[in-house]
Amino acid sequence: DRFVRFLLEELLPDAEAKKTTDGRLLNFSKNPNDRAIAGASSGGICAFTAAWERPDAFRRVFSAFGSFVAMRGGNEYPALIRKTEAKPLRIFLEDGTEDAWNPLLGHWFDGNLLMESALAFSGYEVAHSWGHGGHDGVHAENIFPDVMRWLWKGWPKEVECGVSRNESGWYTEFRSIL
């Protein structure tokens, strides 16, 4: 949580202390529903992690070709997401089928597929765009306006928690027939 604390306790306050060229102070909303966070590659997993750990600070996430298989603990997110009560987050994932691959870590694209599957299973409002490119920003740049429209749809309505399939009762029904 050091990264998100740095953002909230140091970076944003420092930015708010600055003035625009015409002398006005910057004013950032403290309402998490008014905030989004985005990143690409390792920044994509950082953006997701910041919102995951602090949904009281960020509610909208754009992860472009997020390195969920390469960063420590990132490969654990799909299982953690499935086992944790849903949080009020809206998440957009982007990646390309030709993203990076490493014999020790696996395929970055597969990591994003697992994230999308876990988020959908757990009731999150999640969308994705899978392109054919590699570990670069070409596809992400092309879809960025649509991503922003999707992340901010319905604003100022609050982003809400979804209902996880864990909570749908299927497991209880399944156990009752055993």
Regions found by a protein language model. Give the residues of each.
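Non-catalytic cap/lid and distal C-terminal segments of serine-dependent acyl enzymes
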Residues: 1-178
